[in-house]
């Protein structure tokens, strides 16, 4: 039975609210510490999507008063060159956060490079130490997209305790960390992936469904429990009527009528992800000044 009262989870509006709060925090902290927070973004090559993401981050930094340290390398840059830059940024007292824009060219080992980032400046939350802190439930830098998903759910008063959450996708970027965060919120969590038999049978049991695969239109209305909360993390570019458009993993029009809350693409999880990156940078700025990462 369709749910008529489906509402959009407005990531864009929430992101603006968060960034307004961060601006006020930065002004207070800068007066106390004597400098603004600093974020370094490393990009390799000329991938158009990556370039657009980096521009968005740099503009957001400028709006909030975060110093931006951009490093753009040619596609043929060596591993050692990028590694040395990361080490220099680790040692730079003006830099509080370091982000390596993914994906990287095939000749660069992204996992090895992420290991080189100082865990206390790892604002993408992908260093093994920060992932370990997440597993243990300790304070630390959290992966931005999963943290954004949790912030959206909290903003719309979704009480996760006792609910069944199904996460589709098992990547270290989204699927695994968001599953741990949902578990910490006392949801019962099922992870589904490419080897899950009868995916629809699994997704139809979800009170909260998180799709994080990158396969357009994977989730259709017949796969969704009436009244479910649907979070679409996937984002792909498709040619629609001769124009390139961003689409998610969820077939939005049909699923919207089946769900109680749903994120649009674009305008859902994406804007919150950027805000979580900025929030992580400010958190690192504050913690480095306090000399503690345990609170």
UniProtKB/Swiss-Prot annotation:
Residues at which NADP(+) binds: 169-171, 194, 235
GO CC list: cytosol
GO molecular function: methenyltetrahydrofolate cyclohydrolase activity; methylenetetrahydrofolate dehydrogenase (NADP+) activity
Keyword hit for Hydrolase: yes
Family matches, as CDD domains: NAD_bind_m-THF_DH_Cyclohyd
Entries under PROSITE patterns matching the protein: THF_DHG_CYH_2 (PS00767)
Keywords from the UniProt entry: Amino-acid biosynthesis, Histidine biosynthesis, Hydrolase, Methionine biosynthesis, Multifunctional enzyme, NADP, One-carbon metabolism, Oxidoreductase, Purine biosynthesis
Domain of life: Bacteria
GO terms classed as biological process: L-histidine biosynthetic process; methionine biosynthetic process; purine nucleotide biosynthetic process; tetrahydrofolate interconversion
Family note: Belongs to the tetrahydrofolate dehydrogenase/cyclohydrolase family.
HAMAP family from the UniProt entry: THF_DHG_CYH
NCBIfam families: PRK14186.1
Quaternary structure note: Homodimer.
Record function comment: Catalyzes the oxidation of 5,10-methylenetetrahydrofolate to 5,10-methenyltetrahydrofolate and then the hydrolysis of 5,10-methenyltetrahydrofolate to 10-formyltetrahydrofolate.
Name of the protein this chain belongs to: Bifunctional protein FolD
Gene designation: folD
């Amino acid at each position: 039975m369709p749910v008529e009262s489906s509402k959009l989870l407005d990531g864009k509006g929430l992101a603006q609210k968060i960034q307004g709060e961060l601006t006020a925090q930065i002004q207070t902290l800068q007066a106390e510490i004597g400098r603004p927070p600093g974020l370094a973004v490393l990009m390799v090559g000329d991938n158009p999507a990556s370039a657009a993401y980096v521009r968005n981050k740099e503009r957001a930094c400028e709006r909030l008063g975060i110093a931006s340290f951009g490093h753009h390398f040619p596609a043929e840059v060596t591993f050692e060159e990028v590694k040395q830059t990361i080490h220099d940024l680790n040692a730079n007292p003006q830099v509080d956060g370091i982000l390596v824009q993914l994906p990287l060219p095939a000749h660069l080992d992204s996992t090895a490079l992420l290991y080189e980032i100082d865990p206390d400046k790892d604002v993408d939350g992908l260093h093994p130490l920060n992932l370990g802190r997440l597993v243990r439930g300790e304070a630390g830098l959290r992966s931005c997209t999963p943290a954004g998903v949790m912030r959206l759910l909290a903003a719309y008063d979704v009480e996760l305790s006792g609910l069944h959450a199904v996460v589709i996708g098992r990547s270290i970027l989204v699927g695994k960390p968001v599953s741990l965060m949902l578990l910490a919120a006392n949801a019962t969590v099922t992870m589904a992936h490419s080897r899950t038999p009868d995916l629809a049978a699994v997704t139809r049991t979800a009170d909260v469904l998180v799709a994080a695969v990158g396969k357009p239109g994977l989730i259709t209305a017949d796969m969704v429990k009436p009244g479910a909360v649907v979070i679409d993390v996937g984002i792909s570019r498709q040619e629609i009527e001769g124009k390139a458009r961003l689409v998610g993993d969820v077939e939005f029009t049909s699923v919207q009528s089946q769900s109680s809350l749903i994120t649009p693409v674009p305008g859902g999880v994406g804007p919150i992800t950027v805000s979580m990156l900025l929030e992580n940078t400010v958190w690192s700025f504050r913690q480095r000044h306090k000399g503690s990462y345990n609170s």
